[in-house]
Every structure is written in C-alpha cells, then in structure tokens.
Amino acid sequence: MPGGVVGTGDGGTRVVVGGSAVALAARALRAKAVRLAAQQLGVAEDDVQQNGTVFVERANPERRIELGRLAAVAAMAGAAHGVAPGLEATHYFQPPDIAYASGAHVVLAEVDADTMQVRIGGYWVSHDSGRLINPTIVEGQIQGAVALGLGSALFEEIRYDAAGQPLTATYMDYALPRSDDVPPMQIDHLETPSPLNPLGLKGVGESGTLPVAAVVASAVEDALAPRGIRVEQMPLTPAALCRLLRPELG
C-alpha cells in the first residue's frame, strides 16, 4: 500500500491486520535485499549484515553496498540469479481469528445524598492489548475511551418530546463531559503477545470504553446500597437517580 497516497487513520484495530501485512512485506523485502547484497558482494547471505541503509560483509565491513545502489541494481533485469527485478515485496495477511484485548476497570464514585450528583473520584485501568507499537497512542486511546464512556454513563442522553421531535439537538441540551468531569487515571499496561499475528498485537480501538458504563453503574449501586436500588439505564443523571429512589416521581 503506498502510504503517501492511501491512509486509513490510526483508529480502530487496523494495525492488527494492516500492520501485520506491512511487517511481513518488510521482512520479505529485507530478505530480498540481503540476498541481492550477498550476490553483489560475492559472499554468503549469512555473511551480510545490515547497518541502517548500508549492507556490509561481516568479516570485512569496508566491503559494502548502499541501499540506494542496491535498489538501482535490483531494477535491472538479471541483476541477481533467482531474484525478481525491483526492490519491492507484496504480502497479504488475513488473521486466522480475532485477537481479543482484555482488561479490568476500577472506579471510585461518590453520590451526593442531597443532589444525587455523581462524582468520579478516581479511575484505574489494567489493560492488555498485546505488544505496544506506540505506547503514547495507546495511553491516549485508553484515556479518551474512558472519558467517552463516562459521557455515556453520566451525561449523554438523546430525548424526544411526545411528537417525536428531538429535545437534545444542540450542545446546550446534550451534555458532554468537561475536562473537570474526567478524573486522573492510573493505567497499567500488560503486554501478552497474541499468537495470531506476526507482531503479537491485539488492538486497543474500543476496549477502553466498553467497561466504563458497567463499572460506574456498579459503583453507584454500591454507594446507594442502603436504598436498595438497581441501575438498569444510563445516563445516571441526578434526575434519573431521583426517579430510581422515588419511582412515583415518574
């Protein structure tokens, strides 16, 4: 895939499939380059060492060939016996099964007894998405996913009137979490490589947001355990909690 022409973004779990294809193609390309360099240097493939963009003879590093020169040689028909012209490789990858990520979320939730306002005091995540290609992106993905999940659990609600007209059509009516609604998070990354792809990846596209609503609901139920309520709907707005405590309010 010509990366400068086609881009699919870094969302979802594209790196599991697309990244694996790139890795396999890169390995095949390097093997081709080593084979071609060995023939150009007149040595065995095992005697060739790659140093960045230079291929050298292990026993005599002065004997070398630059990658650019190697690419020019590779473009010539018959440049090396048994090597197709061109310094390129194509590889297709189809995973044999889905590589599932896993994790556990813990939340500290407080409910104001007078206003029924829920406050999140802390959030902890232990997460295993396989090998981390870019830990910074993974960290940001989980933080953003938790914030998204908190919005679903506590704020975001689509409402309609009796005529079916939306009542939450603007950001004045449709509540989203603000920065002060998102607590500090402690995220622990586990790296258990998946055997289902060459890079050991599992993906981190959605797993950070899926447990949030459930763990917040469980924490609120625990906080209000003396009242004997059971949370079965989101979001847990003060009005919703008041209705749970006093169903006669409708």
Describe the role of every protein-language-model region.
Residues 1-250:
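C-terminal catalytic domains of large/alpha subunits in multi-subunit enzymes
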